[in-house]
Each structure stands twice: as C-alpha cells, then as structure tokens.
Amino acid sequence: MKAGVAQTAVYNDIASNLEKISGYIERAGREGLELLCFPECSLSGYIRDFSRVDPSEVEKALQSVHGLALRNKLNVIVGAPRFEEGKIFNSAILLSADGAKLVYDKNFLTSFDKKYFSPGNEGLAFEVGGVKCGVLICRDQNHPSPSQRYAEQGVKAIFILAAHYYPPPEAWEKLDKNRALPIARAVENNVYVFKANAIGSQGTTISLGGSLIVDPRGLVISEADKVNETILSYKVEVQ
C-alpha cells in the first residue's frame, strides 16, 4: 500500500479548502498513491463557529471530493464536521476508491471541541492494498487505548488527522510532545503511523506542521517542515 499524508493550510472557507484538496488528490493520483490523508477539519476549517456551518455545503463538497477520488482510483481521508440528529461530530471521512463512505468520530475532545462537538466512541478499521488501517483524530493520539485496540484488531497502519492550532508561544512549546506521541504509538503497537497536520494561522492561533510517517521501530521515515505544504508518502509492505 503506497500511502501518504497531505500537510496543508486550512481555511474557514469550504470552497477554498475543496480547491486545495482537489489539487492534492490529483497530484497523489499522478504519484501512484492508494491512500491520502488530510488534516483535521481540512474541508471546513477548524478554529470557527461550527453551529454556523451549512451541513448541505459540507455534504456537497464531500461528494465532489469522492468523485475526484474515484476518478483517481484513490482512497481519501478528509476531516469535516458531521451532522446527525441534532449533534455535530468532529469526523474523519474515508471516501473509498470502491465507492464506500466510512466515518470515524473523534473520541477525545479538546476544550475547544466541546463547545460544538459530541464525542464518538468507536474506531474505524478498513483495508487498502492488503494492509489493515485505522484512524485517529488529533487529541486521540494522547491516549494509548485507541491505538492498542487497533493493534489487537490486526491494524498495521494508523492515520492521524491533526490541527495543532495554539497561540504562538504554546505552539512552539507543544512541538516536542506532538512529535513524540505518534512515535510512541508506533513503537507500543508495532504499527506504522501516518500523521497529517495543518500549517498556517487561524485567528490568533498557528499550526506548525511537522506531519510525519513513522515505522513500527519508531524510526521517522519522512517528516515535513513547519511552514510548507507538501505530501509525504511511503509504501507499506506487511508480511
């Protein structure tokens, strides 16, 4: 399975995010990727009032992303709010190359998340190219149990969608922690970890990138810088 993460800027404008996501899907298709993961809330923006987001606009954009994924024979994981029965979830949406649409809802919410979102309580495991994969969102990486459950299910690669937006001093202070956690999850569970983080500013906060791919030994195979958009990719081969 050749998989990758897209480190991108994220805006509070769905049309702008859709244009950016579309460009990276086409690039991933040209590069022969089978799976591409985007940051948390990459379709909607993260630092915003989610009660003002139009669910129909989100759904229309997801349909556009899925159509492009299908044309490029690519599985795509995109971050977006999900609206169900009067609740909003911070979700990772898997838009599969075979036409399926699967959902993971963030389990462990930040104080900001709790203003708008309800927590999920289940994982999401799926297979691409013979490799079983799982999904986490941002704060979920702080807790060992979700990754452990995935490993018990035979997952070999975990994809983390992140949006590490903090006030500037805190953003620098959190760099070491947010790099160490995916490495720890990889080593603890003998899995690959692919982490897609956002870059740039939203409001008075910044996200300093550092997306990365880690192997089961804890070796950082590939790592992005703090300011530039990019795709990181690696071919996972499981015996």
Which residues does each PLM region occupy?
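Short polar catalytic/cofactor-binding loops
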Residues: 7-13
